[in-house]
From Swiss-Prot:
EC number(s) reported in the record: 2.8.2.20
Binding site for 3'-phosphoadenylyl sulfate: 79-83, 184, 192, 196, 239, 286-295, 301
Record organism: Rattus norvegicus (Rat)
Record's protein name: Protein-tyrosine sulfotransferase 1
A biological process term (GO) from this entry: post-translational protein modification
Glycosylation sites: 60, 262
Annotated site (Transition state stabilizer): 159, 286
Gene behind the chain: Tpst1
InterPro entries linked: P-loop_NTPase, TPST-like
Length: 370
């Protein structure tokens, strides 16, 4: 009896020892694997999300991301066609932009604030938080947000309108990035933000004069930085010309980005809500507009809405209008003749053929752009 008890105890000890050795072995292998992973470039793996319409990519495809990847940044003053631009690019099977992150322009503005304050700069340097440390942290943060707020794709883009206020800084952080600066007649942009009640930090929506002054300041900042990085990195895209002649401009734009042409960019409205297509936010103000095909319905809505005294002083209030090619005294201006297909799209839009789908409907939107 005692012998049998000893035998059972010995067997139990042997089992416990075996389990312990197995567990320690597994734990050691996991630690080794994690160390190896940390030594490799950051990767995003999501087998389901890598399957995109029109892409011949296996479900286990891995996309690597790093500071030298060819990121695309879309920006401009809000209500200048940035959402339409990103929706058209999102329709391309190789490109993913996604909704506005909202955090990217805020963190960039914070970095600018630190840089402008000489006192803060000294304090940061004394603490060892040098420009190199901050730049490295900014690269990692921005990449993490851009990559992980949507599905993987060969080309990733970000659309946060005011991010391009830091265009030259972004160009330094990401040397292979390209920038699309959306430009629109400031009178149309301002009328859109006022009539649609799009709150923008610093803009007084009760005053056309104030909003046009702020529009001029914002677009001048972004335009100057676009010119500074040069035409090989930054492309001006006039909203009016994009909607009048979308194929011509999208071909030029994709050539600038070194991305193969795909006809789907001309039919973004057909890709909304589809896997690998165009993902829209329920709370962005432009959502109810980009569900429609490209049309010219919004080009001259501002005509007759701006106070006479503001119209009279337009060239002084907003000198960037003339610099960008707009006649400050033309009411309405002649933006050009649309392609036949765009005329047909506009007719269908006016008939009410395109309505907001149920999955995008929500409470009244209260968006603030910073």
């Amino acid at each position: 009896m005692v012998g049998k008890l000893k035998q059972n105890l010995l067997l139990a000890c042997l089992v416990i020892s075996s389990v312990t050795v197995f567990y320690l072995g597994q734990h050691a292998m996991e630690c080794h694997h994690r160390i190896e992973e940390r030594s490799q470039p950051a990767r995003l793996e999501n087998p389901k999300a890598t399957v995109r319409t029109g892409l011949d990519i296996k479900a286990n495809k891995t996309f690597t991301y790093h500071k030298n990847m060819p990121l695309i940044f879309i920006g401009g003053v809000p209500r200048s066609g940035t959402t339409l631009m990103r929706a058209m690019l999102d329709a391309h099977p190789d490109i993913r932009c996604g909704e506005e992150t909202r955090v990217i322009p805020r963190i960039l503005a914070l970095k600018q604030m630190w840089s402008r304050s000489s006192k803060e700069k000294i304090r940061l340097d004394e603490a060892g938080v040098t420009d190199e440390v901050l730049d490295s942290a900014m690269q990692a943060f921005l990449l993490e947000v851009i990559v992980k707020h949507g599905e993987p794709a060969p080309y990733l883009c970000n659309k946060d309108p005011f991010a391009l206020k830091s265009l030259t800084y972004l160009a330094r952080l990401f040397p292979n990035a390209k920038f699309l600066l959306m430009v629109r007649d400031g009178r149309a942009s301002v009328h859109s933000m006022i009539s649609r009640k799009v709150t923008i930090a610093g803009f007084d929506l009760n005053s056309y004069r104030d909003c046009l002054t702020k529009w001029n300041r914002a677009i001048e900042t972004m335009y100057n930085q676009c010119m500074e990085v040069g035409y090989k990195k930054c492309m001006l895209v006039h909203y009016e010309q994009l909607v009048l002649h979308p194929e011509r401009w999208m071909r030029t734009l994709l050539k600038f980005l070194h991305i193969p042409w795909n006809h789907s960019v001309l039919h973004h409205e057909e890709m909304i809500g589809k896997a690998g297509g165009v993902s829209l936010s329920k709370v962005e103000r432009s959502t109810d507009q980009v569900i429609k095909p490209v049309n010219v319905g919004a080009l001259s809505k501002w005509v007759g809405k701006i106070p006479p005294d503001v119209l009279q002083d337009m060239a002084v209030i907003a000198p960037m209008l003339a610099k960008l090619g707009y006649d400050p005294y033309a009411n309405p201006p002649n933006y050009g003749k649309p392609d036949p297909k765009i005329l047909e799209n506009t007719r269908r839009v006016h008939k009410g053929e395109f309505q907001l789908p149920d999955f995008l409907k929500e409470k009244p939107q209260t968006e603030q752009v910073e």
